Regions:
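Positively charged n-region of N-terminal signal peptides that target proteins for export
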Residues: 1-4, 170
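Sec-dependent signal peptide hydrophobic core
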Residues: 5-9
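Hydrophobic h-region of N-terminal signal peptides that target proteins for export
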Residues: 10-18
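Serine-esterase "nucleophile elbow" of acetyl-processing enzymes
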Residues: 19-73, 78, 83-94, 98, ...
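Catalytic His-Asp segment of secreted/periplasmic serine-dependent ester chemistry enzymes
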Residues: 47, 177-287
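Generic structural signal for well-ordered alpha-helices
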Residues: 84, 156-160, 208
Length: 287
């Protein structure tokens, strides 16, 4: 028992003391009102409960932004239209940037990837290319954006269509999901790490790639946090960035828990720094 106490004490000493950013970066982001849509990594309740600070708290300190936070634990792309409705009800057009950081729960829920478009052959008039005459009708393939809430791409289409309609003059930025470690959050919420495929046979990489595709489909910037943030929960050397990197007993239930899915304050600070320097390349205000 004494040996266990000594090990725990040493682990506590090894945890990093998270310093606040030394100074604000002077940029076009100072004073920008940024709405954050997403899941548990964005959820403000983790700050309110004292679990850890978040990337958007650190962005306030790094860039001087103002945060409007709508992310909710467990939410998927299918919840983004509802978060958008709440943003509209609360702030109307008084927002500069909408940032969407979601998708990891779609992977965990085994949501099929689906398609961006359906396709059909239609008869259409074509004028202008060499060899065509005015009024000539010809068969051409035509695609239609799929609004399908049962697939990942379809959900993104629904959400982005709503955001583009509601905020045509605002900066909308997508963030990819980040790497996933194992998480034993409760007896009813056990999630294996990213080396495991989900229930439809897809790895989390596929869900990251689809968000990157969405940038081209919907003409919005995508920041690939999965690649640039540096958080890699599969490596023991990265244990210092996660909320509960090793099995430990819950103070409430006494049951063992682990969490390499949610960054701790040190992890969120690293996220924020990576994100801040990417954001410097984009305008914060378009209208």
């Amino acid at each position: 028992m004494k040996r266990l106490a000594v090990i725990i004490a040493l682990l506590c000493l090894a945890l990093p003391v998270v310093a606040k950013p030394k100074a604000e970066i002077k940029s076009q982001w100072r004073g920008a009102r940024v709405a954050y849509l997403g899941d548990s990594i964005t959820d403000k309740r983790q700050v309110e409960k004292g679990l850890n600070d978040t990337y958007w708290v650190y962005l306030e300190q790094l860039l001087g932004t103002e945060s409007l936070v709508y992310g909710i634990s467990g939410h998927q792309w299918s919840h983004i239209p509802g978060q958008t409705d709440k943003l509209i009800a609360d702030h109307a057009q008084n927002v500069d940037v909408i940032m969407i950081f979601v998708g990891t729960n779609d992977y965990n829920a085994s949501v099929p990837l689906g398609e961006w478009y359906s396709e059909e052959v239609v008869n259409v008039e074509v004028t202008g290319p060499k060899g065509t005459k005015s009024g000539v009708m010809t068969d051409r393939k035509k695609r239609t954006i799929l609004m399908d809430n049962s697939t990942y791409r379809g959900r993104i289409n629904i959400a982005m269509s709503k955001l583009k309609e509601a905020y045509p003059t605002k900066q909308i930025i997508l963030l990819t999901p980040i790497h996933r470690g194992d998480a034993f959050l409760s007896d009813r919420n056990i999630q294996p790490d990213e080396l495991h495929a989900n229930g439809v046979g897809e790895y989390v990489d596929a869900y990251v790639d689809v968000v990157k595709e969405a940038g081209s489909v919907w003409a919005v910037p995508v920041i690939d946090l999965n690649a640039i943030c540096g958080l890699y929960p599969l490596a023991e050397s990265n244990a210092l960035y996660w909320r509960r990197p090793a099995l430990e007993k819950s103070s409430k239930s006494g049951k063992k828990r682990t969490d390499r899915l949610h960054p701790n304050s040190a992890g969120h600070l690293r996220l924020a720094k990576a994100l801040a320097y990417q954001l410097l390349g984009y305008p914060a205000k378009l209208d």
